[in-house]
Amino acid sequence: MSIAETNTTTEVAAPKKKMCCACPETKKVRDECIVANGEEKCAALIELHKVCLRKEGFDV
């Protein structure tokens, strides 16, 4: 492997946490909304949680 290949592979950061442990604040609010109101009424909270997960390095 050349130096150029090594640098390319190290640029991709792996998530530091498991998905189940990432973004506990948005996960809790999202889950409570889904239980109380149903998934279709919580789309905004679901999307906020996905944004948080993406910031943590997950591909969702």
UniProtKB/Swiss-Prot annotation:
Cu cation binds at residues 20-21. PROSITE patterns: CHCH. It is found in: Mitochondrion intermembrane space. A motif (Cx9C motif 1) lies at residues 23-33. Disulfide bonds join 23-52, 33-42. Keywords: Chaperone, Copper, Disulfide bond, Metal-binding, Mitochondrion. The keyword Chaperone applies. Copper chaperone for cytochrome c oxidase (COX). Binds two copper ions and deliver them to the Cu(A) site of COX. The gene is cox17. It comes from the Eukaryota. Belongs to the COX17 family. This is Cytochrome c oxidase copper chaperone. Residues 20-60 form the CHCH domain. Gene3D superfamilies: CytochromE C oxidase copper chaperone. A motif (Cx9C motif 2) lies at residues 42-52. GO terms for biological process: mitochondrial cytochrome c oxidase assembly. The keyword Iron-sulfur does not apply. One of its GO terms (cellular component) is mitochondrial intermembrane space. GO terms for molecular function: copper chaperone activity; copper ion binding. PANTHER family: CYTOCHROME C OXIDASE COPPER CHAPERONE.
